[in-house]
A protein has these predicted regions:
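Short, Gly/Pro- and small/polar-rich lid/capping loops
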Residues: 49-82
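Soluble non-transmembrane domains of integral membrane proteins
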Residues: 77-345
Length: 645
């Protein structure tokens, strides 16, 4: 990039900034727009509130009418006292409420439940409560002739109760029942079947579907609200394969799903609640995500309204499976073995591993190495060992890249001598050709160091996607870091500062300092190998390279300590490798080797091949085109002069 390019980019930036500033609304216009927006939101909220109130009133009126009629369906089931039934194993504990007959509390064992009000972790709980009480709601709705049956209104009677199973039954009339049977497996999967008995004549003729309304307020489980919120999504799996999620933002999202789906998940960063339908959920399921305010203890409020198959004769049960557990890739993948539906559920896709090539690296390399090392070493040591392993794998490419730069460095005096005559701006093409010819004499490819660096990029991006989703880092301590899965603040305050937030992360600062050091070393190395005007232009580019660590600080201050620590260690080792290579490279010996190669090429000239040959051919073509343009311009000028005479 030459001086004119830099000036051009700066002018474009100034024009864009100036245009944006000129076209921004005035303070009065902003206030007016804010007032109009507030009025519109208030009206919408009022209409929505009125609609919900009307629906609640209609339901209450219908319920009151049924309660007043002792002959109505489920008359006895509309009154009662709520009881708790607990199903548990070594992995999870689920509390069912006989009012509604569904799970009202899910506790995941073996994972630290953070007390977010105590920052030092001294009051953390030994287990994670995924939801409790009013956080979650699940109701099934059936269209009967007399009135709609809504399970959340009914009091069920538990029977056949064990630690892993229970049957909930609500009596519609003598000999007519609605039952829900739950069976808990050995891991995180809960099987449920809903079935009627003796109620075939009570339903509408076209009643072969049931409606499901499932909602949940996703709890904030981690100390970093913004970071956890980013990974908290309503995700669903299409019956034909593949997952998708709502594109949540700062506003409420309503979306109709046009495909048939077989499961829907309310996913936190590290834990999920999943509902699977054996006969799939029909098209046009309606999904909602509402963001919650920071400090409320919640991240988002999810709701899924769906329909699935229902047999009113009672011959076939409607079957569902629930997963309440961690977003651990291997656990999610192995959970399918507990499913009785025979589907390829692909739960493991809840763990985001990056774009296709990045996902492939994480899926078949990082995951296995990480799991293997984590069985032996603490997580902090695992990150260091993974860094060392990756550096060992990429070392041959790094060395090749460095040696290419070193060769150009020792050839710098010869390049300056060979290009000394090309000092004018119009001579830049000839100068480039002379440089390439000089490199070819010594068998040096100026771009041979680029490909190894490009090959390393997917590895760096793979770790960027893997570490924030690695539940193994959650709650793990290392050195001064109390939890590798969230930021490690050295200073915190109550107000939110633009770009920074409400804290300073120590590992982020270390990463940025290491980045600054590494940038200085690489810039110095590149400057030492550049000739003439290129070296001067590189000095102008330094400030851009030095701004990168500052940009990274604003980007990564909210990221997990584990990720920042990995980048810090990676850059530290990269700087150490570069320093070692510089100290162990003898410029005189390297130049002697190149001189020997030059003499061999001189005595046995070979045709240039590969990248150098293509670049030389391209430069020659450009030179010929430039020469032809100059000739035509000279002819045109001569004609103008003749006409002037």
């Amino acid at each position: 990039m030459n001086k004119n390019n830099i000036i051009g980019f700066l002018l474009i930036a100034v024009v864009l900034i100036g245009f944006s500033w000129y076209n921004q609304p005035s303070a009065e216009e902003q206030r007016a727009a804010f007032v109009q927006d507030s009025i519109a939101k208030a009206k919408h909220a009022e209409m929505e509130k009125a609609s919900k109130a009307a629906a609640v009133k209609r339901q209450a009126d219908a319920k009151a009418q049924i309660e007043a009629d002792s002959t109505a369906l489920f008359y006895s089931a509309l009154k009662g006292q709520a009881q708790k039934v607990v199903l548990k194993n070594e992995k999870v504990e689920l509390t069912l409420n006989t009012k509604g007959g569904t799970v009202e509390k899910a506790v995941i064992k073996g994972y630290v439940g953070h007390n977010l009000k105590v920052k030092d972790g001294s009051a953390d709980q030994k287990d994670v409560t995924l939801f409790d009480g009013n956080d979650q709601s699940l109701k099934f709705m059936l269209e009967a002739k007399e009135a709609n049956i809504i399970t959340s209104d009914l009091y069920f009677t538990p029977s056949n109760v064990t630690d892993k199973s229970v049957t909930m039954t609500a009596e519609a009339a003598p000999g007519k029942t609605l039952s829900m049977t739950y069976t808990l497996g050995d891991d995180y999967m809960l099987h449920m079947s809903l079935q009627t008995e003796g109620m075939a004549g009570l339903f509408s003729p076209n009643c072969n579907k049931m409606s499901i309304d499932w909602s949940d307020k996703a709890r904030q489980q981690e100390r970093g609200f913004m970071f956890e919120n980013r990974y908290t999504t309503l995700t669903y799996h299409e019956a034909e394969g593949g997952t998708d999620h709502l594109n949540e933002g700062s506003e409420k999202i309503d979306e109709k799903i046009e495909e048939t789906i077989d499961w829907v998940s309310f996913k936190n960063q590290f834990f999920s609640a999943i509902m699977v339908a054996k006969d799939n959920f029909d098209k046009d399921a309606f999904m909602t995500s509402i963001p919650q305010e920071k400090g409320s203890g919640y991240l988002k409020q999810f709701q899924a309204k769906m329909k699935t198959a229902f047999d009113p004769t009672g011959k076939k049960a409607s079957e569902f499976e629930f997963y309440f557990g961690p977003n651990d890739f291997q656990i999610l993948k192995n959970t399918e073995k507990e499913s009785t539906f025979g589907k390829d559920l692909e739960f493991q896709k809840l763990v985001y591993l990056g774009w296709p090539i990045i996902r492939w690296i994480n899926r078949f390399f990082t995951l296995y190495v990480f799991d293997w090392l984590s069985n032996v070493f603490p997580m902090g040591i695992v990150l260091i060992l993974i860094t060392l392993l990756l550096k060992l794998i990429t070392y041959p490419m790094v060395k090749k890249s460095y040696m290419s730069s070193a060769k150009m460095r020792v050839l710098k005096p010869k390049l300056e001598a060979a290009t000394a005559q090309y000092n004018k701006p119009e001579d830049q093409m000839q100068k480039q050709q002379a440089m390439m010819a000089e490199y070819a004499k010594y068998g040096v490819s100026p771009l041979s160091g680029c490909l190894p660096m490009l090959i390393q990029m997917p590895v760096w991006v793979a770790m960027f996607n893997f570490v924030p989703n690695a539940i193994q880092l959650r709650g793990e301590k290392f050195l001064w870091m109390s939890d590798l899965s969230t930021f490690d603040p050295i200073f915190e305050w109550n107000t939110n500062i633009w770009l920074i937030g409400d804290h300073l992360s120590l590992t982020c600062i270390l990463f940025c300092v290491a980045n600054l050091l590494y940038s200085w070393m690489t810039m110095r190395q590149q400057r030492d190998q550049m000739v003439g005007q290129q070296a001067e232009q590189m000095k102008m580019m330094q400030w851009m390279m030095y701004l990168m660590p500052l940009m990274f600080f604003f980007m990564f201050n909210d990221y997990s300590a584990g990720l920042n620590f990995y980048y810090f260690i990676s850059l530290f080792f990269s700087a150490a490798i570069m320093w070692t290579l510089r100290k162990t490279t003898n410029d005189e010996k390297l130049l002697a080797i190149l001189e020997k190669r030059y003499q061999e090429n001189k005595n046995n000239p070979k045709k240039a091949s590969g990248l150098i040959a293509r670049m030389q051919a391209l430069q020659e073509l450009q030179r010929q085109q430039q020469k032809e343009m100059m000739r035509k311009q000279a002819e045109l000028n001569e004609k103008k002069n003749n006409l002037g005479k």
